[in-house]
Amino acid sequence: MKYFLMGLKHFKNVAIACAPDNVGLAHELIGALRESDVMPFDFTLKALMVKSDGIHYSNDFSRVETIWLVIQPNSLAWPLFSEKLKKIIEKMLTGKEGLKWISCNICCGKETRTYYIPHFIEELDVLNKDKCFYSNNGGLIKPAYSSLKIQDYSIFPKPSMNNLWQITAAICISDKVKKEIVKSKISCINYESILIV
């Protein structure tokens, strides 16, 4: 049994979906989205450039390798999945994951694309708590997942404090899901093995 923490490979210059300035912090939005399946605002795509004097945003995408990615980086640090990636994951779901999708629009000039945010509505018990490492305040430092507890899930969030597990970039997927993603020729995703006991 293999599972992986999935994430986007590193890009030096990337397009980032920026939420409007007035939307607040990401963790404050999670509760407000509990009953929603559509984001109440649109994201705007900007080119992110890292220079010696800091990070810069612009509308000049000439140095960006690929503008539209299957997992679009964004100012909320949430997973924004393309429709292609969403469909792959959807067909692999067991129905026990407690997952729904929130659609969002990302605008770039005259083009708008719909992306999807995986929103976990049930906190899944996936850890072998005896094998995990915790900080003095109870925060999870190194998770150890229970093979018995995760065997019925194709995707699940890395547990975290408060409600941050509901919408998180720390998403684990089964080897079957990974193989389907690779088979579909999606190459910009990084896979990190997780500890299963």
Feature locations, PLM:
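Short active-site loop/helix that positions an aromatic residue
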Residues: 84-94, 180-184
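A glycine-rich, hydrophobic loop/mini-helix early in the fold
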Residues: 44-74
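Internal, well-folded beta-alpha domain core
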Residues: 75-76, 86, 97-106, 152-155, ...
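Extended, non-catalytic structural segments that build the interaction scaffolds
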Residues: 67-80, 162-169
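Short coil/turn motifs at helix boundaries and re-entrant loops, enriched in small/polar
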Residues: 79-86, 169-175
